[in-house]
Amino acid sequence: MANVYDWFQERLEIQALADDVTSKYVPPHVNIFYCLGGITLTCFLIQFATGFAMTFYYKPTVTEAYASVQYIMNEVSFGWLIRSIHRWSASMMVLMMILHVFRVYLTGGFKKPRELTWISGVILAVITVSFGVTGYSLPWDQVGYWAVKIVSGVPEAIPVVGVLISDLLRGGSSVGQATLTRYYSAHTFVLPWLIAVFMLLHFLMIRKQGISGPL
């Protein structure tokens, strides 16, 4: 093992990286509530793993979506557990995200020079809610269908561009296959890439600026 370590150390200076990670100063006022962001990240990683597992069996069509979800729940080995963990961690992720936002706000973590960290966090919150909206529709049951119907119809109240936005969300003038395809694409491809990018920016800024001081 020593030879392997020396080989990597010579080329990548991994000890310097390890020292930088493990020797970061943590202010004495930090408590358990400062872990809410990390818990949110953990929930997302669980979401990613369980969601990826379900893509092997889920069929994003209006005629097969519901049946494929039932197949996952009843026929796939541990499918019920994987989907249940996905749902539970989704709820936990939203809850932890909300508590994290409140903690940052109440402790003044949004103030100068951390404005950009706060903005990236707000964007991450919007993306998290978008995950919930798009994922809720994927079983394409009565609850999911009418949820999409309501959500996609809300923008119609916006003057001038409202109808255009609704048609963009639905993939047409009515809810159907195009809608499910768009929500599935957003849930499994667009939103994961967006949240990965903004998480990276968020963590890099936290790493650079450190944890904010007490009020």
Curated annotation (Swiss-Prot):
It comes from the Bacteria. Heme b 1 binds at residues 100, 103, 202. Keywords: Electron transport, Heme, Iron, Membrane, Metal-binding, Photosynthesis, Thylakoid, Transmembrane, Transmembrane helix, Transport. Its cofactor is heme b; heme c. GO terms for cellular component: plasma membrane-derived thylakoid membrane. Belongs to the cytochrome b family. PetB subfamily. Heme 1 (or BH or b566) is high-potential and absorbs at about 566 nm, and heme 2 (or BL or b562) is low-potential and absorbs at about 562 nm. PANTHER family: CYTOCHROME B. Component of the cytochrome b6-f complex, which mediates electron transfer between photosystem II (PSII) and photosystem I (PSI), cyclic electron flow around PSI, and state transitions. This is Cytochrome b6. It comes from Mastigocladus laminosus. The gene is petB.
